[in-house]
Design a protein with these regions (language model features):
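Conserved NAD(P)H cofactor-binding loop of Rossmann-fold oxidoreductase domains
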Residues: 82-87
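C-terminal helical subdomain
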Residues: 174, 192-228
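Conserved glycine-rich cofactor-binding loop
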Residues: 11-12
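Substrate-binding pocket helix/loop in short-chain dehydrogenase/reductase
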Residues: 90-92, 98-103
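Conserved glycine-rich Rossmann-like NAD(P)H-binding loop of the short-chain dehydrogenase/reductase
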Residues: 25-42
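Residue(s) in the substrate-gating loop at a strand-loop-helix junction
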Residues: 134
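Active-site helix of classical SDR
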Residues: 114, 150
Length: 251
């Protein structure tokens, strides 16, 4: 019987890489995103048009409800919560509605879809959920306050739910990538941040699927960011926030 995977944010760099890799592993695909044109192109490119496409804006209640309905009618073996975006600038000067939409996509949608998928997975006694967090969530990040806070939630939420789900045969993996070569930082208007070299999304997805195969609960990619994770865990948070502000302010 063919296994099925649902990928949110499927038309972005990481989502496309997941689509290619999972198709190669024999998964049937449900590809979701906001653009019918981009989803159709992706389905045709990856599967010859056999993948199911679902147009849904996860920044809206209607979009979230659309995917809840899909998951309830078509339980999946693997859920990839990849959709997300960030904004850049001082919080007081950013559009509040846009920041709330960011939380809706990064937190509310992810939490809702995880809850929905877990219902069928725990009943079946198997399944896996991959939630894409970020190394940005390791520390308070001035100029990306909402984004860093949302990704801290994703990481901690995934680890906690993963412990609960394990006894039901369900695996939850929290993935914390560093900068990845995608359109994210164009969307975030964060060109001023000195990021260094960005990772290839194909490499991130390969590492994620290896971690999934090994039943790991958490992945930090590339591995050098485990150092950042350790340091931010022992240093005073106020000091870490000030240091992050200095780094993000470099031109």
């Amino acid at each position: 019987m063919t296994r099925t995977a649902l990928i949110t944010g499927a038309t972005g760099g990481i989502g496309r890489s997941f689509a290619h890799a999972l198709h190669e592993r024999g998964y049937g695909l449900i590809l979701t995103g906001r653009s019918t044109e981009k989803l159709t192109e992706l389905s045709q490119t990856v599967t010859g048009g056999t993948a199911q496409i679902v147009v849904a804006d996860l920044g809206t209640t209607e979009g979230i409800d659309t995917l809840v309905d899909v998951l309830e009618r078509n339980p999946v073996d693997l859920l990839i919560n990849n959709a997300g975006f960030g904004s850049h600038g001082e919080f007081a000067h950013l559009d509040l509605d846009h920041e709330i939409e960011e939380l809706t996509v990064n937190v509310r949608a992810l939490m809702t879809l995880t809850h929905t998928a877990l219902g069928a997975m725990t009943a079946a006694g198997h399944g896996a959920i991959v939630n894409i967090a970020s190394v940005a969530g390791f520390q308070p990040l001035p100029s990306m306050a909402t984004y860093s806070a949302s990704k801290a939630f994703v990481d901690r939420f995934s680890l906690a739910v993963g412990v609960e789900a394990r006894k039901h045969g369900v695996h939850v993996l929290s993935v914390n990538p560093g900068p990845v070569d995608t359109q994210f930082f164009t969307v975030a208007n964060a060109q001023a941040i000195e990021l260094g070299r960005s990772a290839n999304p194909d490499d991130l997805v390969a590492a994620t699927l290896t971690a999934l195969d090994k039943k790991r609960s958490r992945l930090v990619f590339p591995r050098v960011y485990y150092v950042l994770d350790a340091l931010t865990g022992v240093l005073p948070r106020s000091l870490v926030a000030r240091a992050a502000n200095v780094v993000s302010g470099r031109k």
